[in-house]
UniProtKB/Swiss-Prot annotation:
Disulphide-bridged cysteine pairs: 537-585
UniProt subcellular location: Secreted, Extracellular space
Further details from the record: The two copper ions bound each have 3 nitrogen ligands (presumably contributed by His residues) and share a bridging ligand (possibly contributed by a Tyr residue) in addition to binding oxygen.
Protein name: Hemocyanin C chain
UniProt GO cellular component terms: extracellular region
Keywords: Copper, Disulfide bond, Glycoprotein, Metal-binding, Oxygen transport, Secreted, Transport
GO molecular function: chloride ion binding; copper ion binding; oxidoreductase activity; oxygen carrier activity
Glycosylation sites: 451, 618
Tissue: Hemolymph.
Organism listed in the record: Aphonopelma sp.
Subunit structure: Tarantula hemocyanin is a 24-chain polymer with seven different chains identified.
InterPro entries: Di-copper_centre_dom_sf, Hemocyanin/hexamerin, Hemocyanin/hexamerin_mid_dom, Hemocyanin_C, Hemocyanin_C_sf, Hemocyanin_N, Hemocyanin_N_sf, Ig_E-set
Family: Belongs to the tyrosinase family. Hemocyanin subfamily.
Binding site for Cu cation 1: 175, 179, 206
Amino acid sequence: MPSDANEMQARLLQLFEHSTLSTKAKFGLRVIRDPKLAGIGILGRGKIFSCFHEDHLEEASRLAEVLVGAETFDEFIDLCHQCRDFVNEALFVYSLSVAILHRPDCHGISLPPIQEIFPDKFVPVETIYKAFKEATRHADKTDDIIVDMEATGTIMDPEYNLAYYREDIGINAHHWHWHVVYPSAWDSVKMHMRKDRKGELFFYMHQQMCARYDCERLSNGLARMIPFHNFHEPLEGYNPHLSSTQNGLPYAFRPEPMTLCDMHDVSVQDLERWRERILDAINLGEVTDPNGDEYALDETFGIDVLGAIIESSRDSKNRESYGSLHNWGHVLMANIVDPDGKYQTNPGVMDDTATSLRDPIFYRWHRFIDDMFQEFKRKLKPYTKDQLSFTGVEIKNVKVHAHEENVITTTFVEDLLEISNAFNFGRTGAVKVRYQHLDHEPFVYDIEVENHSARLRHGTCRIFLAPVHDELQNQLTPEELRRLMIELDRFRVELKPGVNHNHRHSRDSSVTISKQPKFDELLKGKGTNNANEYCSCGWPDHLLVPKGNDRGMPFHLCVMITDYLYDLVGDYGYDTPCVDAVSYCGAKDSLYPDRRAMGFPFDRPIPEGHASNLHQPNVSFSQIKIQHH
């Protein structure tokens, strides 16, 4: 990292500050724009930018390519200054973020939290309005102001019981950041960088979101979600209570019951046709490109090929035939209220990666998408005992050390979000929103493993969690459990001959990240190192485990140790920088550091009679409880 890392960080942060306000006074006005910016600025300022929308994404990708292609850091900054005030506000932030993450001279630079750049995507409009009222009322302009987050619903709606999860700032920021790290329009040729197993990561990260959501539903006494399956059925209602500061209009409220309608760019029939073509390809075991060449959907690369097609990304083998099912589905649902733009309303939250997780239909839609991936997985043979075993390694005992052994406690805690970096309140004091989020007590896994061989061995420890019972308190079958297994951690262990005690703290999870540096902390130099830029993509640590219930909800804890020498990809090691959230986000500029399928061993179906294959010496199933206070 160059010695002036803090200065570079500060120059970039200026571009994000007050992103919806003009910066001509700050950066100056260029009369003549750089020719590289020709054709950029089509999406007007004030419009809602969506990286699910084909045209929006195309423009954002062109801008990102220009910014990444700048030869020097100064040229990069100059291009940013030129386009900052004529490019759509959210599109600019998205493209700038993609560029920062992928420019070699920006390695070590941290992105500011998206929730501080666009708090209007995370904070109810009633709360923001209250903050402005308080800022006006306080005579002392140097005082900090704190307002409480307003509720977005009532208990009359059963889904409101899950608002704490769907509207959690951390997971919505994670979703936005994941799609910045893995843009669907990423062009490997132009960017000179291939995103390893990007299609499979798209499948796995969203599959885990669905599994986690169902675990939360069961924690709250609700039934598991019903997957979306019929393009003509009415959708449940949802009111996000968000309003865009880019144009002052609210994100569209979806009343009940409404059904999907055709838009100018895409029709409901298009989505149905793409679904059937993708399912046909899965059943045939191959996809066809525009030239008629066939690509087998095999057990090694098939899921990656399928992920690129379903999303769809630039890596899709045939976008003309298989379309863009996932992306256009988001757009159609977001525009259900005003599909032809007759009333000039904003789309709903499904249009935006920073807001879509708030809507219950997001999870039903992604369970539908995941069901298509599972159709492919059902074509693969179940794992054999040989594929699941690690000869000579035996897990003797697993404990979870917390305040009470094998009981993890969750609770709601308070946190603050500063919003004065986005809005001009006319004061020097900070303006913050106080809100609550779910959190868990710290805990430590104690895994006793015996290495029966006479030599040192290395293993990959994989830890998963799934509820014991369904919504009717029936025990879940192995196949049902498989779809609900959430990954808690994956790490390397060293196994000396004899008995080994391996301890792993929950904060070190390969799934999660701890808190990102805040905007003001970044200005002071915190976070400028090589271990940050991809790491901020991970799942929030405070939602590592589900909520549980007040009685202590029982969960299966599965611990599996596999052969690290087989799992290892190339010369990659877990000591490489920036792998704290490798499970969902991969590793920076590297191959995905695990040869196994993502979600292994629960990625493939477990037919009746095959569950015993998992009962190996190197696999442990135990029960723990998660208790909510």
